[in-house]
Amino acid sequence: MTRLILQRLVQMALIMVFASFVIFAIFDTDEFKRKLAVAELGGFGVAALSEEAYANWLAQKGLDVPFHERYAQWVGDVLQGDFGHSFEKNRAVGPLLAERLWNTAILAFWVFALMIPLGLLVGILAGMNEGSPRDRALSFVAVFTTSIPEIATAILLTVVFALGLGWLPAKAAMIQGFDPWQLVLPVLTLVLYAFGYLARMTRASMAEVMTQPYIRTAILKGLPYRRVILGHALRNALIAPFTIIVLQLNWLLSGVVVVEVFFEYNGFGRLLLEAALFGDVYVIQAATLVAVAVAVTSQLVSDIGYTFLNPRIRFGA
Amino acid sequence: MSTTLERPTRPSLLARLENPKAVIGLVLLMWLPLTLYVMAPRLLGSLHDVVLLPAIPATLLLYTLAVRAFRGSTVAVIGLSLVFFWLLMAVSAPYLPLIDPNRPIAPFTPPLTEARDHFFWLGTDMRGRDLLSRAIWGCQRVLVWGVTATTVAYVIGTTFGLVAGYFAGWWDEVISFASNVLLSFPVMVLFIVILTYLGPSGLNIIVAVTVASAPAIMRIVRGLTLDIKTRDYVFAAQTRGEHPIYVMLIELLPNVRGPIIVDACLRLGYTTVAITTLTFLGLGLQPPDPDWGLMIREAARSAMLWQFSYMLLVPALAVSSLILGFNLMADGLRELSLRD
């Protein structure tokens, strides 16, 4: 067990080192640096930047040293919490990123708070009797909601609830301070898209458990059906969904981009896109690094949790 | 035993077409002209106006064949019908009586009304361009770029998967580590990083989709290969002294096909969503040609009102129906493959 966790930790560290290298290397090209120089020094564009001014700027920023030194410098700064400076927003990247991540965390909290009970409930109800009309109906709903892309779900919800009925605000820009009503549509969009996957995985796991001999024994020895489900089936059926739930965090970091942009919610995804469209290199580097760190950590938690929950693996390895 | 001799009847056209060669031929007849039409219109020269004509009967024949092959699953037939509806729209768009999709006529015309001598079934957008025409022309770009990107991702992912699974050892170590690194990026983050680095365009979307999906495909193929390479027929081929490339292409590849086809249907859906979403975000295909993501982007900026909501709904429903088609097709195929 300890060995497995250590092995995983080493693997995760290796992936982080490699990923950070890739992220640093692809944005450390001459082209991006010239753009940055123009943004800082002012001027009419990359073509008008003289070689001399560019060389001076590089020297002033300490960027004229060899690549590996710059990389080491960047990693050192990042480890100390210094993520550089955003040119578009004209402020330090660290606090900016923290602020946006907090907003996305609020969104993610509500998404998980709704998605987990809904997905598990639908999955368990469908998987209890595989092939029954209830299973077919619930499975169809799960496939259907997952098949509609987030952008389309966002549009449908906005048109009906914001533009048509006028019950909810159409945007979540939160210009006049935090307003929980503005969160409803983004959260609903993400939940509708994501719960179907969890429900399908829970259903598959539940359906498999229900075919096991010990369930048949429990039924045959006359236990009430409720106790068979709650006491015997669920314990084993929920191991696989647990890993899925943790891994959904990785998906959520992708999913929030389009939802945050559509609803103009000031979260991590919108920050990343704005930085990408502007060419705000330090923001892209920092945001990507954080995204990878979150994804790798959730992978680790999911793996360790799985081993912990499933004794067959814990003692087998 | 009955002794009556049956007079040999000529098999019907459909029955004769039910073999892999004919199906591949039909797919090429449908797909090559469409790809050229969308990606390299200048290359076609004077053929430009007629090149898609033979693709229309090819599409219809393929649809009939597919329905016959998958008639055991209602879900698969519904999915097929949705996908083939858009395929048919894509190949026949130039010959349908549509208004030019880029021509501004009467801005903000609601659906089912006539304005300036034109009847608009689905209304017009804020620049007065016909939405019906834009929705139908838009599916061409989404389908062509989506399918091409997925195909490229599959070719590369499968190659690496076969190599990693068959040679094992340090080939496997290196390929698996590289794919683990790529898989640790959230997909949309990876797309944004790649498209920022390369710049937004159709070709770069192919690169981005390949980098993002090839690792996952490689994992599936690698797993299947590790299982299949212990079979007797693989040993037989190795003992005969066949070249590794022969073993991989002739012995292994045909046997990993089944699970991959289901995965490909799902992945076609993901890619279509990704292209639409990236275009909506401003990182994908560029204006002014019609495209669903672009239609959403333009409408979301300037028409956020109840009376103009049709501008958002048309592209949203179009893309949803296509994705639903791919997903139902994958579900039906899985159901059918489990039944055998």
List where the protein language model places each region.
Chain A
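An internal, D/E-rich "acidic patch" concept
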Residues: 60-120
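Alpha-helical transmembrane segments of integral membrane proteins
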Residues: 2-4, 97-134, 150, 175-317
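Coil-to-alpha-helix initiation sites in intrinsically disordered, low-complexity, charged segments
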Residues: 52, 62, 66-74, 92, ...
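N-terminal Sec/SRP start-transfer signal
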Residues: 1-13
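Juxtamembrane/transmembrane-helix interface segments of polytopic membrane transporters
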Residues: 15, 19, 23-28, 154, ...
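Membrane-water interface segments at the C-terminal ends of transmembrane alpha-helices
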Residues: 22-33, 55, 76, 140-169, ...
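Hydrophobic alpha-helical transmembrane segments of membrane transport/permease proteins
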Residues: 15-72, 165-182
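Transmembrane alpha-helical core residues of multi-pass small-molecule transporters
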Residues: 11, 19, 114-115, 142, ...
